[in-house]
Amino acid sequence: MIGRLRGILLEKQPPEVLIEVNGIGYEVQMPMSCFYELPNIGEEAIIYTHFVVREDAQLLYGFNTVKERALFREVIKANGVGPKLGLGILSGMTASQFVSCVEREDVSTLVKLPGVGKKTAERLVVEMKDRLKGWGAGDLFTPFTDAAPTDSAAASSNSAEEEAVSALLALGYKPTQASKVVSQIAKPDMSSEQLIREALKSMV
């Protein structure tokens, strides 16, 4: 079981990062709410991981705090919710926002998340409301900021849009939906991370 990685960020391709630890590169998929808070490429990062073994793959899901990882593990315990859907859920909103939605039984907001229909949203509320009692939000979770991306190197407008669409597809959004929302919000000076952030905000 791989539970924590501390190393140098080599690549950031939303929603995946490549982090080098003692000469070994680990590919880690992260919710966008955590991805935004990562340091620059070439800098040290600490990622708390959840390890998934399938017949065809071994996957790592990463988080900035132990609490965020714990919430992810609670989410994927819900009937019909796997790691990919859990990643999409915690990309569409922050951990604290999700906890708040469950506590308030806000099904109408949950159904806006990728892959979450009404039945799944209702199931999340029913199955998780008691389990999340007392969690609270505050400083336990990574804040969802509007700060500019940390990487100094900005991609061109077209490649940023393509990268944003690819990230949304990886999170479970449909191709037509992803392309439409990115084209609507895209501006020449926006990075892929800014595009993804604004796209996710507009769809929730």
From Swiss-Prot:
Keyword list, A-Z: Cytoplasm, DNA damage, DNA recombination, DNA repair, DNA-binding
Annotated region (Domain II), positions in chain: 65-143
Region (Flexible linker): 144-155
Region (Domain III): 156-204
GO molecular function: ATP binding; four-way junction DNA binding; four-way junction helicase activity
Disulfide bond residue pairs: none
Listed Pfam families: HHH_5, RuvA_C, RuvA_N
Location within or outside the cell: Cytoplasm
GO cellular component, one term: cytoplasm
InterPro entries in UniProt: DNA_helicase_Holl-junc_RuvA_I (IPR013849), Hlx-hairpin-Hlx_DNA-bd_motif (IPR003583), NA-bd_OB-fold (IPR012340), RuvA (IPR000085), RuvA_2-like (IPR010994), RuvA_C (IPR011114), RuvA_C_sf (IPR036267)
A single BP term in Gene Ontology: DNA recombination
Subunit field text: Homotetramer. Forms an RuvA(8)-RuvB(12)-Holliday junction (HJ) complex. HJ DNA is sandwiched between 2 RuvA tetramers; dsDNA enters through RuvA and exits via RuvB. An RuvB hexamer assembles on each DNA strand where it exits the tetramer. Each RuvB hexamer is contacted by two RuvA subunits (via domain III) on 2 adjacent RuvB subunits; this complex drives branch migration. In the full resolvosome a probable DNA-RuvA(4)-RuvB(12)-RuvC(2) complex forms which resolves the HJ.
Sequence similarity: Belongs to the RuvA family.
Domain topic, free-text comment: Has three domains with a flexible linker between the domains II and III and assumes an 'L' shape. Domain III is highly mobile and contacts RuvB.
Protein name: Holliday junction branch migration complex subunit RuvA
Encoding gene (name): ruvA
